[in-house]
Amino acid sequence: YEIRLSLVGSEMCIRDSDKGDLLDLRLLMGADTLDSLLPQVLAPLEKAGGLFAIPCGTPSVSCWFLDQSSLESLGLTDVPATYADLMTLISTYLTDFASDSDVALADNPGGMADSLFQQLFWAQLARCEASGVQPTFTDADFVAALRQYIALRPALVDYETRWLAERSSSLGDLGDTGGIVTVLSVSSSQPSLLHLNTSLTPSKTDEVPLLLSFSEGGALLIPMTYSVLAVNRRSAYPDDAASLLSYLLDNQPYDAKLALLPDYAALQPNPAYTEAAQKILDDEALYMQYRATLSPLEQKQAEDILTDARAALHQIPPNVYSAAEIAAYHARLNHAHLLESSFWVSGDQHVSTLRQRLLDGECTVETFVQELTRIVQ
């Protein structure tokens, strides 16, 4: 290959650079291009002053959003601050509201139980990395959260199953008019922090991100990963490869630029707004050109049409994201932690088997966390 695309864990990139398989992009692309990126984005890809990969595409993150309007409609007020709080909220919903509420637990509960387990796993891994310690899963607050999850899981899986069955049969007894929790499932191939339309911004104004820790006052971290590009040291065309990487970096989607460039705050015009505004200008010019030839009634009709068009224009956002959305995006990004370890995305068979044994009741929580710690260390 000339250019390699892979998913961070950066361990994989550093391993390949140690073997001499990757070119140092600082020498190849120039510091000015690369130093414009967020330092925390580049740090896991650096080794001994060299940079051996660059990010590509919008990050994938693990984060749920809370719909405050739905929460209040259920007579609840407390926004979860810890994973224990979140699981208590889910348990309260399943016990008190699931059978007869018009508010669904989530906008898409399918796979929610597995997503929650994954989120706990990633959050503990992120906490260890951010603290500079080896991955461990024996911390008391993580073990307590895992116990709470194991107790909650059967009811949550049952809710998922019934919700999906009733939704597919159009009965809708569990409701689909809104979600108390918006589930943002994270995929290794497609960034999924929002539904499918934005990045770290909520889909509705009354949604708030659940920035959770394992204990009160603990670190608020959003585990994050993204794809990276690297250049084969044996490439016959390193300069061409560097030019292509520079082009890809400069022409990434707006979401990706927001996530990777700290100073990228320029508002991107909304094409729909631009097109509508230009049409109004064209229509106004046409009206002024022929106004003298129109009857009073025709003039009134034309002016009413223009007035309605201007009013409609005010309903279209002038930019893809507002300045406030960009600010919120970067504020949330400050809590994001780029996962450096690669085993969690590599489909480690030992981890998968151990997880399944835990969920099937074939091993205790104590055995699980001890064995998991042994595997990852």
Please report, for each region that a protein language model flagged, where it lies by residue.
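Hinge/lid segment of periplasmic solute-binding proteins
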Residues: 11, 15-63, 206-212
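Short helix-loop capping/hinge motifs at secondary-structure junctions, enriched
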Residues: 70-79, 234-241
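Glycine-centered hinge/linker elements that transmit conformational signals in sensory
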Residues: 90-91, 132-169, 200, 204-214
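Short helix-initiation/N-cap motifs at beta->coil->alpha
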Residues: 83-85, 160-178
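Extracytoplasmic/periplasmic solute-binding protein
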Residues: 47-57, 62, 85-147, 178-187
